[in-house]
Amino acid sequence: LWLTAGDTQYRVKHAQSISITPVVFGIRQGLAEELGFVGTEVSVSDLLSAIQSGKLNFCMTSATQSNSGCSAYIGFLYALLGNPDVITSESLQTPGLSEQITQLLSGVDRSSGSSDWLKDLFLTGGYDAMVNYECLIISANQELEARGEETLYAVYPYDGLSIADSPLGYVDNGDTEKEQAFLDLQEYLLSDEVQNEIQRTGRRTGYEGVSEENRDVFRTDWGIQPDRVLSPIRMPSTGVLMEGLNLYQTEFRKPSLTVYCLDYSGSMEGTGREQMVEAMSQILIQENAEKNLLQASEHEVNI
């Protein structure tokens, strides 16, 4: 996703997928049973209904700062728009979309800028669900089970399922020796032995299920679907993607309360203080913040 959006100079070559993982809801087992999500196909509309009823809250990374959050967000939009061939700029202005996606994102009770950090945050306790990579739901469950705690049940929203691809590409700077070293590394990572080791970490290496010897990692009692044939949604163009992310940042996401603690001690005199002020200007001056999708929404509170 970000590789495609960021390679504006078309310098990346030899890109090949090393692993993939769907972005799913991991819901506390007991709650998933209560919601009727166990052993059945679940839609984004079903998830929205659970959020609207106050029965489901979840942790999710920021769509503007993390691939898992962005992938989930695009999947939500895709489903709420009725599964179009592709999301367009006009699609984003569809009547009712703003209200629905805002209601869905109102269920986010904690956020993070990283998928791994989100998993670590979730494991501190006190949360019912998280949206994350399937491989990190598996990892979280391995730790929860080792602690003797309730595990998560994986829910795959069938009408808005995003697949996170992990391609490895070479940034071409004209160095043929480095390019060959890259190709050797890529060949190693794509070898059968290493692909099997990657699959043992809970990451898939293809769209048509997992190998028999690794099924013990992809446990069906956790809701993991090792035999599911993954059909990824079609991602929008880079321009539409950025438009959607700006709407997420300024209109759709749950407003945040942010408290900044700034160090004005003597040790910050001179360059340190100048750099701190410059950093804050990149966040608080909205024209600057927009360049990195950090702008505030109308109802946000900054202290």
Regions found by a protein language model. Name each.
Residues 13-25, 95-104, 112, 147-174, 188-210, ...:
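Periplasmic-binding protein-like
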Residues 13, 18-22, 53-55, 62, ...:
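Extracytoplasmic
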Residues 176-189:
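Short amphipathic alpha-helical coupling segments at ligand-binding clamshell hinges
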Residues 78, 83-156:
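Ligand-binding pocket segment of bilobal, Venus flytrap-like solute-binding proteins
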Residues 1-55, 59-62:
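N-terminal segment of the mature folded domain
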Residues 254-256, 261, 266-303:
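…and closely analogous acidic/polar surface helices at protein-protein or active-site interfaces
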Residues 206-260, 264-274:
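Acidic, polar low-complexity linker/tail segments
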